[in-house]
């Protein structure tokens, strides 16, 4: 459903056969979980156990979350009239969490995961010989100043109780081996994250202003390509309460955290939650020896999570359809 450009190093017999591609985030396991729930619900229906269930249940298998741009697979499905073709009163999504004990459920109402935007910056000066900097307009110095100034946005423009991140992933100026050349241009690549839509807007405004003015103060010009990615993921309070209730009934009080701290990572399911109420939750993939974070060449979805995730999906469907 959604592989990553990573060479798998798990040593499993079922490891990826495609060189340089692997399921490094567990989306194959998520697919198996939902298929397992579909099978369980079909068996319950055949046995007559669903006679008090009312309504229609839509199972959404959404690809391309790892795309990271243009709203990912979620926005593509929304734009393709997903909810007009398959109406939904509420929607729910789940992701495994390698840092949590196996089967433990974490969620929170409100903002749970950050927005994610990408920024490409090109600073242009006037290149020349390194021995004569006075005859140049050095874009490297301007870029270095921009890097430092960007850090003031979070510390001086964002509410201290808010959450925001501006990370510089790349700074490139000049070519290898050109020690005596002041380059014509410098490039920056940024990752920008926020847990509030207003903060997200503020970050874009200040980043654009600061880069322009800071570059001009050195005599350079700057172009900013600001690409909005996934929005803030906001869980609906009533849907979150329902997920928490079902999880506690399935696994017990000590296996549920209904007020988990917000996460700086991003998820395109947020685009679906902008048009339909619902809840996105995490289930522990296990934190024992050998476990590792997603997007790692040694990552493996823990198949021992399948029974718990299938049970969670089935119980949630039952609760929703009985409530109708």
State each model region's role:
Residues 4, 11-22, 28-29, 40-181, ...:
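Histidine/acidic-residue-rich, glycine-tolerant segments that coordinate divalent metal ions
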Residues 23-24, 303:
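Short acidic-aromatic active-site loops that bind/stabilize oxyanions
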Residues 1, 96, 285-286:
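Active-site metal-binding loops of divalent metal-dependent hydrolases
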Residues 2, 103-105, 220, 297:
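Generic structural motif recognizing short loop/turn segments at the entrances and edges of beta-strands
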Residues 141-324:
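Metal-dependent amide/peptide-bond hydrolase catalytic core
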Residues 8-13, 295-298:
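Enzymes and membrane/adaptor proteins characterized by extended Gly/Ser/Thr/Asp/Glu-rich
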Residues 31-36:
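Cytochrome P450 catalytic-core helices
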